[in-house]
């Protein structure tokens, strides 16, 4: 009971720390101005060390969040929480490089078995997309000598509360289903004024504000199968998230302000107006091969057709295309049962990912490439501290676009204990 109290207290403290310290500064990327922002990979920090590999490879040690069909591997009660930190350099031809750092809650979750090693349930809270940017640009005044300067800022995103159920149907075949409650709040603001006017000339700010919110449900399915080949296993997995029309509302307002921010004129263009956000379905496949508890190598592929996306009320032009993500990853544990050598019980991971994002800017689809590595440090009996790292870049300097060179750190804590939910016995 004392161990359980420590685990619960530690987990709750980690979750509270995640919300209070990093959630408000979720991301910084000019590309997140598009659509509903940056789409977040759902994999927990442990699999982020392998580039996000997780559609076919289940684990007893961490939350199986990438494919609900693998939940039966979580055979004991589990609490898991993770955060992500990122530092990046943003470059564009003709401008000075800009450095930024940000962080956010990566996930908070619990899972427990309904039938040990056969059927498990999980509850997961994590972001689906993140908006975070603040930048400005100037364009020449038509038939004039001054510039129009526009400041852009935005924050928020879409979040998911996922209820998942997964279990064995036959000895090697498992199925899973998830229902996600999607909710969001996105705020964007565009402020424009004429730069360079004489001091005795009236100058005003034109402020365009938009707020978007949504809440609704969407469904997802998963399947997994494995073949025994000698002492090793060949694992296959697939996921399918259904396309969803998410119910929402939006608010648009146009204001004329003095330079100190006092409103002169305001016009509400839309007030709590009904809107539906069409989120594309997801199809994913995975294959992996390895020896349980020792080593594994695998590959994943996921795609979404963002051409169907509908729901943006942004005043800027937006273009979308099909997104695709390719992942290669591997993990190795020298000796999971070693008593004398702690380093042999550590699980080491490496991976790489190539992501064709859904965003098309100036006729160019924005790509993201990353190299990943990480490890899991075992603590107590069945728990671990998980670390994942990613070095990569997104975008290009060609065609007057923006390139982001980034370094991401994923940290997670997983607490497993088979005494949770066990009724105490008294003599």
Predicted features along the sequence, with ranges:
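Bacterial Sec-dependent N-terminal signal peptides
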Residues: 1-29, 427
């Amino acid at each position: 009971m004392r161990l359980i109290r420590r685990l619960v207290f530690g987990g709750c403290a980690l979750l509270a720390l995640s919300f209070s310290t990093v959630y408000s500064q979720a991301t910084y990327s000019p590309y997140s101005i598009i659509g509903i922002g940056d789409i977040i990979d759902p994999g927990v920090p442990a699999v982020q060390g392998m580039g996000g590999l997780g559609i076919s490879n289940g684990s007893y040690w961490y939350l199986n969040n990438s494919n609900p069909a693998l939940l039966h591997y979580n055979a004991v009660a589990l609490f898991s929480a993770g955060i992500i930190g990122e530092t990046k350099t943003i470059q564009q031809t003709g401008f000075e490089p800009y450095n930024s750092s940000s962080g956010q809650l990566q996930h908070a979750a619990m899972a427990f078995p309904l039938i040990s090693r056969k059927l498990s349930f999980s509850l997961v809270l994590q972001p689906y997309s993140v908006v975070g940017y603040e930048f400005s640009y100037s364009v020449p005044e038509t038939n004039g000598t001054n510039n129009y300067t526009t400041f852009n800022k935005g924050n928020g995103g879409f979040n998911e509360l996922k209820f998942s159920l997964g279990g064995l149907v036959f000895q090697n075949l498992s199925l899973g289903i998830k229902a996600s409650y999607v909710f969001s709040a996105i705020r964007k603001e565009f402020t424009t004024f004429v730069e360079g006017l004489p001091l005795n000339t009236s100058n005003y700010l034109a402020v365009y504000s938009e707020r978007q919110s949504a809440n609704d449900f969407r469904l997802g399915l998963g399947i997994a199968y494995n073949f025994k080949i000698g002492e090793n296993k060949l694992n296959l997995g697939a996921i399918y998230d259904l396309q969803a029309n998410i119910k929402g509302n939006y608010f648009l307002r146009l204001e004329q302000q003095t330079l100190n921010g006092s409103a002169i004129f305001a016009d509400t263009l839309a007030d709590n107006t009904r809107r539906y956000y069409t989120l594309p379905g997801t199809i994913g496949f995975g294959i992996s091969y390895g020896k349980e508890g020792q080593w594994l190598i695998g590959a994943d592929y996921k795609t979404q057709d963002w051409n169907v996306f509908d729901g943006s009320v942004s005043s800027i032009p937006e273009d979308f295309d099909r997104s695709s993500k390719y992942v290669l990853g591997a993990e190795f544990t020298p000796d999971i049962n070693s008593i004398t050598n702690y380093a042999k019980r550590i699980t080491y991971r490496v991976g790489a990912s190539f992501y064709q994002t859904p965003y098309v800017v100036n006729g160019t689809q924005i790509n993201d490439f990353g190299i990943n590595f990480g490890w899991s440090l075992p603590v107590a009996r069945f728990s671990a501290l998980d670390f994942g790292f990613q070095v990569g870049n997104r975008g290009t300097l060609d065609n007057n676009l923006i390139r982001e060179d980034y370094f991401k750190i994923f940290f997670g804590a997983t607490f497993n204990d088979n005494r949770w939910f066990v009724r105490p016995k008294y003599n």
